């Protein structure tokens, strides 16, 4: 029974990451009507940027903030230079562009960092958390808490901020939201 509970917690941690990525895909699609097939590769590229900063001696939270800034700027550049020019194009054109971005990000990351997996340091301690006779990886517990915190922040953003409410209105009824 202990192993089953450990595996459930580990599965929840991994599933939380997949759920967050799926939520990001849905949010982008609702806002732009574009399915970004390169989203995973863009996240991988940002992770490698963080890994590079950590290996250069930047503290963990400094690398985290630096990665967020660089990923945001990179996303803005990709949206303005690559996605926006094909915004009104047929859907197949947009799919081809995002698939092209996928290949480009993957190839550039492989060229810079090679195609060998790299170990990424965890911000959580390596010692397991013990609850009775059951041991949980602190990384799994940390992933679950971080995912819940991020989801709560996203929920509050869309529920209580003017920008979040406007984005919900635009996603629900684009024509009516343009009139307001």
Regions found by a protein language model. Give the residues of each.
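Small-residue-rich transmembrane alpha-helical segments that form helix-helix packing/gating elements
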Residues: 1-32, 37-170, 178
């Amino acid at each position: 029974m202990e192993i089953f509970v450990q595996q459930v917690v580990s599965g929840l941690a991994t599933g939380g990451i997949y759920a967050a990525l799926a939520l990001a895909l849905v949010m982008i699609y609702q806002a732009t009507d574009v399915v970004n097939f390169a989203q995973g590769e863009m996240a991988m590229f940002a992770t490698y940027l963080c890994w590079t900063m950590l290996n250069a001696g930047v503290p963990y939270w400094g690398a985290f903030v630096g990665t967020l800034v660089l990923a945001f700027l990179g996303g803005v550049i990709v949206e303005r230079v690559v996605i926006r020019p094909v915004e009104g194009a047929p859907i197949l054109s947009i799919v081809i562009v995002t698939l092209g971005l996928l290949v480009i990000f993957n190839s550039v990351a492989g060229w810079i960092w090679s195609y060998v997996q790299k170990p990424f340091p965890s911000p959580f301690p390596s010692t397991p958390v013990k609850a009775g006779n059951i041991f949980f990886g602190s990384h799994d517990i940390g992933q679950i808490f971080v995912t819940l915190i991020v989801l709560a922040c996203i929920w509050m953003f869309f529920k209580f901020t003017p920008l979040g409410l406007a984005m919900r209105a635009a996603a629900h009824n684009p024509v009516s939201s343009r009139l307001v």
